[in-house]
């Protein structure tokens, strides 16, 4: 199948639309880096656009705009459609979490008169990429009286940053240089440097005590309070244009916040009530297998769909309505895929691999080796998506996750398919996925928005 770079066929108005949309996205991904922050942003914007908490509604009718929140980390937005709900819904599901470092429950330690935060990495990171990189600390801490304290340090102009110190090349020959990439630094040594000045005291660990004193003075947080906290360490800094032509975006967390942003904007921008109920579901925990009560494996989707249908059907409601509605639904698993990286192109089947700037990739399946753990979209669904994109003049390309037996991975698709929902993976291509600086195309970003909006409209 012949590939052509679509950018050269755009007129100036189309190029400006892409560039303006990209600036909004860059502001979003620079500011909101954790699942709690993304969820709060989405809720705030939705409320301003007229979305109402579904728990406060007793009845639902076509055109109603509602949301369901799951423990401040996942959220679903829905616009009730004109068609009977049992005829199916259109889901777009993306995830709010990204690979990062999480503070341990008792994280503050002192070594050689330096204070550190001990961490446990979250998701599939290359550990060595996080060494000597400016980091910010974000999250929530619940004090012993139950008060919630929010933390966001490292991205404001006058904030300090934090760092995991690497070994200098003059002394790394035995300890690091000849090791495999996943052994360059042990997970236990991913410790964040946070302090170096001591306090005047006869007690041991003078630097740790000084750091804890500063934390208590500013945030009222005591050492024991970290037990009831969610502290996430993420790269500091803002999204940047990449290249002289500024056609690419470099930023942390584009997996999967590029799909979060585009799926949100597409449902928020719907001008008319859709035929089928449109649902934008932002979920947590995808990077560690969609586990936990805020992940897609928690059955929260089944809960809010059941509640929604009950408020539509009222006395006519029965469980079969829920099963029919799910079985007749379609879903886009809105997650990024691996673009060809010319420096490591040997891992790709280039005929079936996406390129930056060629439109939104359609990924029929993911998985490992013999499609293990994959959700393999049926040809009928792929045909539907293909016709939809072509009809709306949206640029698209095919995608697979590398050569057979080269590696592999998965998305939320298999969990959606577990409900009987016909599901396909469709999200922008990324270079340097799971790194502190992921790279995407502005053209692909905008075409993802157009594709998701067209899907909701049908």
From Swiss-Prot:
Which SUPFAM superfamilies does the record associate with it?
Aminopeptidase/glucanase lid domain, Zn-dependent exopeptidases
Q: Which GO terms describe its cellular component?
A: cytosol; membrane
This entry's Enzyme Commission designation comes to: 3.4.11.-
May I ask which residue range the UniProt record assigns to the signal sequence? none
In this chain, Zn(2+) is annotated as bound at 95, 170, 434
**This protein's name:** Probable M18 family aminopeptidase 1
Q: Which UniProt key words apply to this protein?
A: Aminopeptidase, Hydrolase, Metal-binding, Metalloprotease, Protease, Zinc
Q: List GO molecular-function terms, semicolon-separated.
A: aminopeptidase activity; metallopeptidase activity; zinc ion binding
């Amino acid at each position: 199948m012949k590939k052509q770079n679509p950018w050269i066929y755009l007129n100036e108005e189309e190029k400006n639309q892409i560039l303006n949309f990209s600036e909004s996205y860059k502001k979003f991904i620079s500011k909101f880096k954790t699942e709690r922050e993304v969820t709060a942003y989405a809720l705030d914007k939705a409320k301003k656009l007229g979305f109402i908490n579904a728990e406060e509604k007793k009845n639902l009718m076509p055109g109603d705009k509602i949301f369901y929140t799951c423990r401040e980390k996942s959220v679903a937005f829905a616009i009730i459609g004109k068609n009977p709900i049992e005829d199916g819904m259109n889901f777009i599901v993306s995830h709010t979490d990204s690979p990062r470092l999480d503070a341990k429950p008792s994280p503050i330690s002192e070594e050689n008169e330096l204070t550190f935060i001990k961490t446990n990495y979250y998701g599939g990171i290359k550990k060595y990429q996080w060494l000597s990189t400016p980091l910010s600390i974000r999250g929530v801490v619940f004090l012993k009286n139950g008060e919630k304290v929010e933390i966001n340090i490292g991205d404001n102009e006058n904030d300090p940053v934090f760092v995991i110190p690497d070994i200098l090349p003059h002394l790394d020959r035995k300890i690091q240089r000849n090791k495999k990439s996943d052994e360059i630094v042990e997970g236990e040594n991913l410790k964040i440097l946070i302090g170096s000045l001591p306090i005047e005291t006869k007690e041991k660990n003078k630097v740790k005590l000084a750091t804890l004193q500063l934390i208590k003075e500013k945030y009222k947080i005591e050492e024991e309070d970290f037990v009831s906290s969610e502290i996430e360490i993420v790269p500091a800094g803002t999204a940047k244009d990449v290249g002289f032509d500024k056609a690419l975006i470099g930023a942390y967390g584009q997996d999967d916040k590029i799909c979060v942003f585009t799926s949100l904007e597409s449902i928020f921008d719907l001008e008319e009530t859709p035929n089928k109920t449109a649902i934008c579901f932002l979920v947590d925990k995808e990077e560690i297998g969609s586990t936990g009560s805020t992940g897609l494996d928690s059955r929260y989707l089944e809960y809010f769909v059941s509640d929604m249908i009950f408020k539509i059907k009222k006395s006519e409601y029965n469980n079969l309505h829920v099963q029919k509605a799910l079985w007749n639904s379609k879903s886009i698993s809105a997650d990024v895929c691996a673009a060809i990286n010319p420096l490591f192109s040997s891992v790709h089947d280039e005929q079936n691999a996406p390129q930056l700037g060629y439109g939104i990739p359609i990924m029929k399946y993911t998985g490992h080796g013999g499609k293990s753990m994959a959700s393999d979209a049926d040809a009928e669904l792929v045909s539907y998506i293909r016709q939809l994109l072509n009809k709306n003049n949206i640029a698209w390309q095919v995608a697979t996750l590398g050569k057979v037996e080269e590696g592999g991975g998965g998305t939320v698709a298999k969990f959606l398919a577990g409900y009987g929902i016909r599901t396909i993976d469709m999200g922008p291509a990324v270079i340097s996925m799971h790194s502190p600086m992921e790279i995407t195309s502005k053209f692909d970003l905008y075409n993802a928005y157009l594709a998701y909006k067209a899907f909701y409209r049908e």
